[in-house]
């Protein structure tokens, strides 16, 4: 339908679209957009443009929303993955750390296993060497038996026609043949020795195989191949190693006829100076060349006995032994030493020497299991084990070495220097005790002074120290310890830094410390636990810390300052005893006076006390105890903190104590029960501990310090009585003062001491005891020699193996006075000694001639040593002049004893006069005055000088004048 307008214009009517109801809204979204030529009916309006724009905006917004959601989802996924990765990384790191620790432990166990294998190898080698020596001895003895039988038969046949009585004697040729075959069989047994191989210290260890089947082969055959041992190889026979010729190689010479002059020349050359190495070893001198047995492979089939009696003067073995000891005997001016591949210098002052390995005690020296007591230098080894070099020493004791040492030890002074174990470098030291080392050390120890320096364990760096005790280290230390003074410095555990200290006690550290401890004065400074900072202190006792302390303790005065527990601040104090804190204290304790101040339990305030005895606490006290009086301080029950006191009685604790006791005064300090910390005390009685102690005891004063039970650490003390230990000790005892130091039980390390009485050891000791001062050197009993001079009634024999008489400037052989029961007093032959023994008339340990007054041990071990006690050179000359032909003096001469006792002022005065008249007219008088308290608290000398005098009769002087005429 077409609409016609009412008004007709010039253009005429136009067609118009019929509007619908929805034409008022925007155009459809499907309508096309306008172009330039489409304006008019086809062009959409603005409403349509608005719709298109809104549609596009929604589409773009939806896409942006999808991207945002995806981004958030990826973020959450990243967080989860990162968390899982961190967890896996932590677990892997922990596993790697554990694996690394296992590798380190494996390496340590491997090194320890190698060390033990090498130790076993060396012991096996020493045993094989001893077996070789025993083979040689058996063959020699069999040849001597056969020779003696033939000599007896010849002598009886010669006497048959001229003797009044004739004994029918027939040779049992069948038994002799069996004996000869058995000896030949034993002599032909060949043992292969291990040869040590050095391996690199890495996990990729070089494995060496061994052809050692560890079974003997017969004849001259080769050993059967076998599987080897880790890092060990055996390629050389015992016959190609440095051979071990006995010290007294007999020379069998018939001056009438000489079947083979080269044999005598070869035998004589074995006692001359000779040095060999493993590359060009020297063969042992075979006695088969002088005594070819029937059926043997060497020599002729006839018995050709060239024998020279040992008692005949000339080139016999006695002269060889005398020549070997000429450099060390005071009665011989010659310094020629007789050394071979093995140089056995006995220091016997011209006495007879039995073959090695027999355990025979010799006059002037003990030599058993490689232990040489007194007399110059030696190269004995263990049980006759030889070395390849000569050890030289000068002075009382000289120097020597035991084990597989291949280098020279040199020392001068009393004790010199020595080494034990697999040392390959020399030890050098001068002074009383010198220096030495034990274990697998490969670097030298150098020290001067009483005790010098030494090291134990797997140390690879030298220890250097000067003074009484010097310095040393134990454990896996790899850095040197340096110290000077009495005690010096040392370290235990896994320390890798040096300890330096000077004064009595010096400084040391225990545990995992990595920084040095430095201190000066008596006691110095030290630390225990996980400390990483140094402790510094000066004065008697110095300063130290225990537990998790990370800051230094500093103190000056007797006792200084220290701390226990979780303290993080220093303690400072001055005075006798100083100050310290225990438990969870965070503030310092300060006190001055004898005893100082301290705290127990959970105290947070200081305790202060002054007076004799100081203060103490018992049980669960939280308030301070303060007291003054004679008796000091102590605690009983379940105390876990230290007791400290000063005064008569000192301090001590009983029960389950785990902390140290410290005290000074008469009685010192000690502890019983399951103590695991050290006791320290100074004064009469010193300090000691009983039970399962594992830490050292240190004390100074009359009685020193000692320990009983399963101690494994050294005891150190100075004063009358020195220090010693009993039980299963494996470390050395060192002490200086009257009585020296010694050890009993299964000791395997040396004892060193200086002062009246020297030092010695009893039990199964296998190392050397050395002592200097009145009483000479030391000795060992229980397998290495005879022990004399112990107890209040002593047996003094001129043929004792102890005492170091070769170091005295007296006669080579002292008179045999027989068994002489001396008066029961320890202060005989000592001037102005003060005895602190708990008995009224005699000291514990007894002994005479230089014995300590306060439990001073056995004292000088030979009767002749008493002549060195404060008498001077005039008495020496007088005594030497009154004993011509001393060894021929009779011990059956008459003697008389007169004793008087009186009581005055609470004191018991006992005077004893012992007079002995020898067979040559010599009169020896012993006059002793002993003053002791009547209450049994102790015995004290009144300072009476010994009146040992030698009165020569007219007949004795006449005999001496005749003896001295040309």
UniProtKB/Swiss-Prot annotation:
The entry's keywords: Blood coagulation, Coiled coil, Disulfide bond, Hemostasis, Repeat, Secreted, Signal
Entry's localization field: Secreted
GO biological process: blood coagulation, common pathway; fibrinolysis; platelet aggregation; positive regulation of heterotypic cell-cell adhesion; protein polymerization
Composition bias, Polar residues: 210-223, 230-242, 515-535, 659-679, 920-936
Marked site (Cleavage) residue numbers: 11-12
Origin superkingdom: Eukaryota
Residue numbers spanned by region Disordered: 208-804, 831-857, 885-966
Modification after translation (UniProt): Not glycosylated. Conversion of fibrinogen to fibrin is triggered by thrombin, which cleaves fibrinopeptides A and B from alpha and beta chains, and thus exposes the N-terminal polymerization sites responsible for the formation of the soft clot. The soft clot is converted into the hard clot by factor XIIIA which catalyzes the epsilon-(gamma-glutamyl)lysine cross-linking between gamma chains (stronger) and between alpha chains (weaker) of different monomers.
Gly residues composition-biased segments: 430-440, 448-458, 466-476, 485-494, 503-512, 539-548, 575-584, 593-602, 611-620, 629-638, 647-656, 682-692, 718-728, 737-746, 755-764, 773-788, 844-857
Name used for this protein in its record: Fibrinogen alpha-1 chain
Classification of source organism: Eukaryota, Metazoa, Chordata, Craniata, Vertebrata
